[in-house]
């Protein structure tokens, strides 16, 4: 079961992501555990390398997404990070922390499914390799 963190300070974007993930679960017969964090400092408060996928907003009130991603990478090289941003220019910065992808706001279901298909394939490939 894929563990997903959503780190986003805008409630509308949180709700859109959850709605899209639930729709994806039904369409693809997948199951996710999703946890919401309202800011970068919230996920780092008690971070453990449990997440397979982290949706991370770039602009947040207390700690921006890029700083949060750098701190996550210090303790977790495996979590896939997908940045959520209104500005495509931040995508280049994401490569410095080995981000999987970025999604432009407002989040569109088709954009999420393309990225999620790739993530699920990577996750199941890693899981099967670990079992072998």
Which stretches of residues belong to each language-model region?
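Charged, solvent-exposed alpha-helical segments that act as regulatory interaction surfaces
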Residues: 27-30, 125-129
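Conserved sequence signature across two-component system core domains
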Residues: 7-8, 37, 54
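Non-catalytic signal-transmission and effector/linker regions of two-component phosphorelay proteins
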Residues: 1-3
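CheY-like receiver
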Residues: 45, 51-127
């Amino acid at each position: 079961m894929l563990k997903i963190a959503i780190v986003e300070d805008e409630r509308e974007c949180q709700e859109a992501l959850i709605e899209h993930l639930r729709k994806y679960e039904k369409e693809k017969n997948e199951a996710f555990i999703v946890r919401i964090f309202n800011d970068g400092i919230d996920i780092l408060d008690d971070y453990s390398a449990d997440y397979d996928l982290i949706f991370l907003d770039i602009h947040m009130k207390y700690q921006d997404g890029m700083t949060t991603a750098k701190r996550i990478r210090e303790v977790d090289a495996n979590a896939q990070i997908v940045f959520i941003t209104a500005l495509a220019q931040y995508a280049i910065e994401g490569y410095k922390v080995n981000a999987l992808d970025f999604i432009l706001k407002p989040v569109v279901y088709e954009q999420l499914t393309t990225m999620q298909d790739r993530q699920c394939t990577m996750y199941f490939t890693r899981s099967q390799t670990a079992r072998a």
